């Protein structure tokens, strides 16, 4: 507009739109779509009822209005543009993109908990876009189906607790077999009655209940037998990686399988090969690489992750690698 670039939230290439201005800078403006006069061929109807770009819309994802294959193409373009604008680098060749499921692929999330009297009580969900407010969401087509189905019942559970004002977050993690853990961040110790309700919820929904009174390393299961119950599978390599619900893992297990397989295939490791994996974490690459190489060295700064990676190597018969 008038020779100035305008970035418009919610608009797609080739569309004619009417937008509202959000802010103006010397070299560009920011705006948000208010109506669409001519739609792009890649625009689709969002599946989520609270997806959008206006006030109150969910900040959990940003591309449901774009056809799934076009989303991948767009992300690829963003990567190439960033490499050039920041690093002045252009790839000599590009691998074909990896595609995965469009819906219910997110196996981990941090959900904010807020008791909001103006909205009728407890909310459990993602933040609204560009806001500290919690979105009034009752389902989520991105989270795994079982977790999406828990969102409204979780509101009822938290509402019934004496410490509902002292429980700011619920972290959710789902294993490759569907096993689910709920980590309740608590700023005050739950009462005996609170614990009974939490455990009853876990039994009803088939979820392991964890408490986190302080930082991530303080997270612990109410039942110690569930300490390493969650796991993800890499069947091509015969590897299972156990993890705590607060550990870093890829949110999309299906894509992770393909990514690990492709990376190791590209490495083309000889049988006598030696490999170093920096920032190895739980061993997402280290352990499957160990099934191909003669020796692997995993380097990681977190003592807890190192300990769990060692146990993972032993459990998968790779301790000597």
Model-derived segments and spans:
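Short, conserved phosphate/pyrophosphate- and ester-handling motifs at nucleotide-, phospho-/glycolipid
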Residues: 14, 143, 252
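Extended interfacial segments that mediate partner engagement and assembly in macromolecular machines
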Residues: 34-167
